[in-house]
């Protein structure tokens, strides 16, 4: 059991593939090859990992849990592996999310991994080669990853600079799956499925997204993601006038 109960149907129906990414990810999982998801914000990277956790669990008839960590500039290696905490009886060690995933098996997903501090890279390197081990210096312990463990990371290449980028020594430990904005036809289906609006409105929103993305070559710094188009559709579905829905969900979200 994944603990999804009420949302299991939602997870099952929530991802529409754009290429062979499901087959590639499943193969990587079977062969214990770490996966790097790269692409712009709002192109479905997180949704894809959620779906694959469900998909692989269904195929294997056993739970393959997903442990997601939203990386940020203050995230340290200790946040991932664990730390000592003080309680009434003294100090005790509490495993971090990465350690729990390594021990019990499952997918550990580090979202926007380049945002984390550099010491986190040192931690994940031994987990992403033939060793598949996690070393916890504070405990003096070395853990071999469970057979069902897989490391998955994501990042947005468009946001990176010389100070925040994935080193080649890190990149080449992963197979990479690229996520791009879907075709207008597919995006129409996604918007319709996710927001519940009819095909005509979904098509108009997909067309709007495509036109806005063409403006990124003319000074617009951020493209309209599929996510914000879905948000606009949800507002329209709930009775907000279409132009206003697009203004608050799309225009004001990507411009200042």
Residue positions per predicted region:
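AAA+ P-loop NTPase catalytic core and its hallmark functional loops
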Residues: 1, 7-8, 12-203, 207
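Short glycine/serine/threonine-biased micro-segments
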Residues: 4, 80, 103, 217, ...
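Conserved AAA+ ATPase small/helical "lid" subdomain
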Residues: 188, 194-250
